[in-house]
């Protein structure tokens, strides 16, 4: 086994009427899974991710923000559920205003987690959040074959309820008639049962190691029962700089009994590759700050009823604004002189709007403030995808 520690915290409260988790357990699972995907040991090598049991595609709204991921496959067996939610993967206006730095292709697929299909080839990471407890034994037996035998990903994450925790739930309400937390659950494993399932997988597929963790910590007086939701992280040994036991199969055969996946929807996100030199990028930032300073100066002149042909922007102020992009006083002064701007007494002389300037490009910046406003609006729209109640 290997180790993985989550940095996100949580608070569990138990009162006379019930138990509450802050943040909700589904948010903790999402947070934990994002942290796993972004682990520095393998993040840059995770380009294609497949999520089985994607349901309403809530987790996708977080996963799509990882810039290193370039292909996401969202798989569920329920076609009607996919059809109701397929538009939620489309780019927002903000995705066009602030494009990604790398491409992102998203595919919504109808299929069974137990079936191998062409769309699953070359997958780097597999995510299955609260899925395995919903399948019957015959499907459960085929899941490792499809994922570890056919797909051979670098990383796999499973989460499932921890039945040891149910003793706390039954203090307040009985479990459902099927004996579980959800009417569609076919089983709920204890921590030992889940561990044994994982051990069976690495015994059959020795190229992998696993680590067990979880989210939704119990109250202090019940620490022995473990977390409400348990998580297994499988990592291919070469991701941990270890020798593979068996060579990878270059092109594994698709199981003849597998039903091919059906493509429901495909979308490609806008992206922009910045080919400018570092010097060109810095000059753009300098121009933006000069324009901003000039607008503020002219606005104050209008309010005070005073007008001047030039305004002086201290280089120290400019440096303070641009230090985060690697600006230095020497680099800024060099750029200013190269672009025919006058520097006197540690200040840049900026001409007023009614005078011609060699560095001024009114069309380049005229829509900047309106774009910023639009970006704020769309970021608020994005947030609603992260806040829905758990189903």
UniProtKB/Swiss-Prot annotation:
Bilayer-spanning residue ranges: none
Record keyword Membrane present: no
Residues reported in the UniProt entry to bind Mg(2+): 130, 133-134, 185
Keywords linked to the UniProt accession: Magnesium, Metal-binding, Methyltransferase, RNA-binding, RNA-mediated gene silencing, S-adenosyl-L-methionine, Transferase
EC number: 2.1.1.386
Residues bound to S-adenosyl-L-methionine: 76
Catalytic activity as recorded in UniProt: small RNA 3'-end nucleotide + S-adenosyl-L-methionine = small RNA 3'-end 2'-O-methylnucleotide + S-adenosyl-L-homocysteine + H(+)
Residue spans of biased composition, Acidic residues class: 374-384
Cofactor remark: Binds 1 Mg(2+) ion per subunit.
InterPro entries reported in the protein's UniProt record: Hen1 (IPR026610), SAM-dependent_MTases_sf (IPR029063)
The keyword Magnesium belongs to this UniProt entry's keyword annotation: yes
Cofactor(s) listed: Mg(2+)
Top enzyme category: transferase
CC annotations in GO: cytoplasm; nucleus
GO MF annotations in UniProt: metal ion binding; O-methyltransferase activity; RNA binding; RNA methyltransferase activity; small RNA 2'-O-methyltransferase activity
Region (Disordered): 354-391
Organism superkingdom: Eukaryota
BP term (GO), one: transposable element silencing
Known role: Methyltransferase that adds a 2'-O-methyl group at the 3'-end of selected small RNAs. Mediates 2'-O-methylation of piRNAs, single-stranded siRNAs and long hairpin RNA genes (hpRNAs). Methylation protects the 3'-end of small RNAs from tailing and trimming and could constitute a recognition signal for appropriate argonaute machineries.
Family assignment from sequence similarity: Belongs to the methyltransferase superfamily. HEN1 family.
Name of the protein in its database record: Small RNA 2'-O-methyltransferase
Native source species: Drosophila melanogaster (Fruit fly)
């Amino acid at each position: 086994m290997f180790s993985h520690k989550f940095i996100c915290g949580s608070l569990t409260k138990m009162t006379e009427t019930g138990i509450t988790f802050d943040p909700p357990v589904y948010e903790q699972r999402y947070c934990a899974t994002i942290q796993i995907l972004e682990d520095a040991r393998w993040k840059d090598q995770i380009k294609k991710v497949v999520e089985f049991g994607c349901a309403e595609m809530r987790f996708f709204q977080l996963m799509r923000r990882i810039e290193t991921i370039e292909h996401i496959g969202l798989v569920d067996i329920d076609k009607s559920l996919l059809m109701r939610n397929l538009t939620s993967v489309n780019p927002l206006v903000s995705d066009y205003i602030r494009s990604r730095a790398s491409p992102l292709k998203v595919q919504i697929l109808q299929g069974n987690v137990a079936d191998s299909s062409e769309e699953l080839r070359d997958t780097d990471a597999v995510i299955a959040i609260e899925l395995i407890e919903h399948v019957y034994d015959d499907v459960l037996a085929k899941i490792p074959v499809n994922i570890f035998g056919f797909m051979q990903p670098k990383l796999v994450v499973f989460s499932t309820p921890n039945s040891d925790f149910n003793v706390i739930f039954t203090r307040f309400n009985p479990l459902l008639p099927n004996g579980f937390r959800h009417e569609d659950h076919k089983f709920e494993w204890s921590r030992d049962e889940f561990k044994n399932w994982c051990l069976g997988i690495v015994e059959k597929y020795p190229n992998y190691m696993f680590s067990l963790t979880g989210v939704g910590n119990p109250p202090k007086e019940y620490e022995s029962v473990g977390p409400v939701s348990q998580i297994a992280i499988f990592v291919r040994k070469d991701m941990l700089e270890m020798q593979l036991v068996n060579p990878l199969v270059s092109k594994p055969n698709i199981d003849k009994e597998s039903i091919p996946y059906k493509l429901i929807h495909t979308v490609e996100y806008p992206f922009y590759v910045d080919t400018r030199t570092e010097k060109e990028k810095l000059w753009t930032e300098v121009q933006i700050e000069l324009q901003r300073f000039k607008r503020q100066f002219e606005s104050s002149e209008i309010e005070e009823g005073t007008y001047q042909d030039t305004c002086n922007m201290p280089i120290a102020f400019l440096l303070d604004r641009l230090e985060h992009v690697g600006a230095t006083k020497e680099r800024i002064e060099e750029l200013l002189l190269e672009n025919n701007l006058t520097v006197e007494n540690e200040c840049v002389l900026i001409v007023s709007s009614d005078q011609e300037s060699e560095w001024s490009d009114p069309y380049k910046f005229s829509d900047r403030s309106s774009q910023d406003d639009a970006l704020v609006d769309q970021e608020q729209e994005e947030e609603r995808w992260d806040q829905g109640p758990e189903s």
